């Protein structure tokens, strides 16, 4: 079994959101994680809030993501740039992910270019 690291978490996040697999995506987050999405002006808190976010902005818009770049600042953070396409057209997303010691996502700051 391949050891889990932040790169694996990022790749898995892209794959599970592209598959619209909300349960598998939520498994990557700590129970009290937060997504702060500046582009929509809201914070989504905990698994319930993140589930709502995924349903609304990924499932309902048929969003597909492609990783453009990733910088891993240390064991606790990653900055990624993602190409989003879906029913809304096309956008480039900028995400700053923070991880806990168990490699679960605890916070995402999200915005669009």
PLM regions with names:
Residues 1-19, 23, 27:
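Short, low-complexity N-terminal intrinsically disordered segments enriched in polar/charged residues
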Residues 9, 21, 53-54, 93:
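Hydrophobic alpha-helical segments typical of transmembrane helices
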Residues 22-23, 31-68:
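A solvent-exposed, acidic/Ser-Thr-rich amphipathic alpha-helical stretch
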């Amino acid at each position: 079994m391949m050891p889990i690291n932040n790169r694996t978490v990022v790749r898995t996040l892209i794959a599970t959101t592209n598959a619209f697999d909300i349960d598998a995506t939520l498994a990557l987050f700590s129970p009290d994680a937060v997504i702060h999405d500046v582009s929509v002006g809201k914070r989504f808190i905990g698994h319930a809030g993140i589930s709502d976010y995924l349903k609304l902005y990924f499932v309902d818009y048929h969003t597909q993501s492609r990783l453009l770049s990733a910088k891993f600042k240390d064991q606790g953070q990653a900055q990624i740039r993602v190409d989003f396409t879906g029913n809304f057209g096309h956008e480039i997303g900028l995400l700053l992910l923070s991880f806990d010691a168990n490699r679960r996502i605890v916070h995402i700051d999200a915005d669009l270019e």
